[in-house]
Amino acid sequence: MGSIRPFNVKRTAEEIAEKYPSLFTEKFEENKRKLEKMMPDVSKRTINIISGYLTRYVVKKKEKAEREIEENAAS
């Protein structure tokens, strides 16, 4: 069972993902490094939490897009 993320973490991660859609990938470490450069004054723990949620958000978004393509192809 996973942990529940605070609303501000979700909102921040989703805003960043929408603002820079091609910048973030499915790799946590890469996303973490990019966030550290974007937000240098944020604590390491917060960066890790946002990066983790952002990574999952990107993966879910990609899987959803793939599912929609498959459903449209089957129709």
Curated annotation (Swiss-Prot):
Keyword match Cell cycle: no
Keywords recorded for this protein, A-Z: Ribonucleoprotein, Ribosomal protein
One GO CC term, this protein: ribonucleoprotein complex
Gene3D superfamilies found in the cross-reference section: Ribosomal protein S17e-like
InterPro entries: Ribosomal_eS17, Ribosomal_eS17_CS, Ribosomal_eS17_sf
Keyword NAD belongs to the record: no
SUPFAM superfamilies given in the database record: Rps17e-like (SSF116820)
Top-rank lineage group of the source organism: Archaea
Record GO terms (molecular function): structural constituent of ribosome
Gene Ontology BP terms: translation
NCBIfam families to which the protein is assigned, alphabetical: PRK01151.1
Family: Belongs to the eukaryotic ribosomal protein eS17 family.
The protein's name: Small ribosomal subunit protein eS17
Gene of this entry: rps17e
